[in-house]
Amino acid sequence: VFFQYAPFDVEGGLKFWGHYTSEDLLDWKYEGTALYPDSSYDCHGVYSGSSLIDQDKMHLFFTGNVKIDGDYDYINEGRETSTLHVESEDGIHFSDKEEVISFEKYPEDFTCHIRDPKVWKENDRYKMVLGGRLKEDKGAVLVYESEDLRDWKLERVITTPEVFGYMWEC
C-alpha cells in the first residue's frame, strides 16, 4: 500500500509517498518512504496517483507539484503540475522519475490544478484519468490513452452541464 503523507508538517505540507507491504493483509511492514519530492518536477510535493502491475513490473504514476516564487494566485498561474512515472521490479527500488505529461501539454481551458492519475490497462492500451479544475471554476476529468505508458494522448474531457464542484480530484 502506498500513501501520501507529510512527515514534517501535521498541516499537510511537503508531500511524500510512504509504503507498507503485507503477505496476508493482517500483518504489515513499513518499507519507508517510496517517493520523495527530490526533482525539478516535484520539488514542492509528490501528490497522489496510482500503481499498475504490467509485464512483471510495477509502474507508479503520480503528480509532481512545483510552486513558482512570486505574487501568484496558484490557481491560474504560479504552479506547475506534471504527471510523473517510475517503475520497479521489486516494489522497493524505483527507476528515475520521468515526466509523461508536462504541465504545458494540458488543455488551455484548465487551471494549474490537474492531478491524481489513475491508470489501468484496457484492450491492449492504457488509460489514465486525471482530476482537474476548469478556468470557469468547474470540475472535470481528463481521459488519456497510451500504447506504451509513456506517450499519452488526450481522448476527451468529462464534466457536467451544471457546476458540480470547482475541482475534481483523487
For each feature predicted by the language model, list its residue ranges.
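Beta-rich carbohydrate-recognition and catalytic domains
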Residues: V1-D116, W120-C170
